[in-house]
Amino acid sequence: YFVRLLSVPVLIATCIALLCVTNYGTNPRRYSFAAVSGLTVQESSAEELYDVCAYLINEANTLRENLPEDENGVFQLSNDVFLDADEAKSSFNSLHDTYSTLYTNGKPKPVLFSEVMSYLDISGIYCPFTFEANVNVHMNDVLIPVTMCHELSHLSGYMREDEANFIAFLACLQSDDPEFRYSGVYLASVHAMNALLTVDSDLWNRADALKSDALRRDIRSNNAYWKQYETPVSEVSDRVNDAYLKANGQENGLRSYGRMVDLLLAYYRDKLQ
């Protein structure tokens, strides 16, 4: 009887482990997106990074001009988040013709109690047990479309955060909805500018001067949103997430988010010459 009693939790644990391995466990060690996409990642100068930053900021400025705003002049999505989830899936799957490994049958799932995710400093999370791409829809609207596409990248098998960010950027560019394109370019510009600031503050100042007032409002609002959730709980969550990423083959941990910039540089290298 005791052996039979023990067999139940053992069976449950085995099933959970099997789900983790089949739905997630091997994906962090698959071929990188850079390898299968044909993009050549290489060292780049600060001037090359500036060119990408300037291009992205100018694109963001242009896209932002006619987008809806709230009463504070901050970007606001015009559609219901469930309609945006449909658009995210459509835009993501349109990448399949160019990148054959990108496709999913799933859709992003707006989370009902999203503010809890904000307290944990989480904008989205892929659940390998339910095979769901969960998205925080309490955060600023500017990040919701690109986060939806980011989580679909995980659903498609790309678990590295840097690659998922870049794939999400590509998916947003595919959309016919300017709100999606703006969201993708916004995220890319933030990552690129953060990288530029670490290598050349003068070039960063030159690029920063290009930002429109509307883009600045969105950046300030987004920063203020996350600032209010900087608590001991979010710090613990960051440490757990860092350990989680390292345990799954992302040796740079949370810093691997910054590696998206290398893919951006590779993507724009020929386009900006």
Q: For the regions a protein language model found, what residue spans apply to each?
A:
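Pan-zinc metallopeptidase signature
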Residues: L215-Q273
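Second-shell loop/turn segments in exported
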Residues: L39-A46, L77-V81, N134-H138, C149-S156, ...
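Hydrophobic alpha-helical transmembrane segments of multi-pass integral membrane proteins
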Residues: V10-V21
